[in-house]
Amino acid sequence: MNVIETGIEGLVIIEPKVFGDERGYFFESFNEREFTEKVGPVRFVQDNESKSRYGVVRGLHFQKGEFAQAKLVRVVRGAVLDVAVDLREGSPTYGRWHAEDLTGENHRMMFIPRGFAHGFSVLSEEVVFQYKSDNLYCPSSEGAVAWNDPTLAIDWRIPKSEVILSEKDKHHPFLYEQ
């Protein structure tokens, strides 16, 4: 696997080694030994999968305190713009974000350390999105930043009139209100 730095400490893009032939392809989506060597130790405890359609924006979500989560995210089918925002207090890159095209074709993954908000927009007709997390989901520790925070000014690459949000995601505070 190839690890690509993003300019934000700990937030990396992972390109797996894909083996393909006339039958299709194969790649390791996670190998604990290699991940530990190239990125650092992590113990994933929960896998999640979602299916969404074009225009959906999910996020920007995080968990607080002892329930903070690191995530390894990827797309099985379709395409997203995946976004991680550094919320680590004292970080020299606090409030900075990185966006990456993750697709079922490029097989790229993003490793998002604890202390980041995460979200994505669906750019294809449909997407199947998977992620591993190193801590269990805890509803009472949920936090979020508004997807359209003007300070962050994230271009989700979807016209605002076509954005589809959950009721919950419509009402998150801006970063400065945290």
Question: Each PLM stretch: what is its role?
Answer:
Residues 118:
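Active-site micro-motifs of SAM-dependent methyltransferase domains
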Residues 1-108, 121-126, 133-178:
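Non-catalytic, conserved peripheral segments adjacent to functional cores
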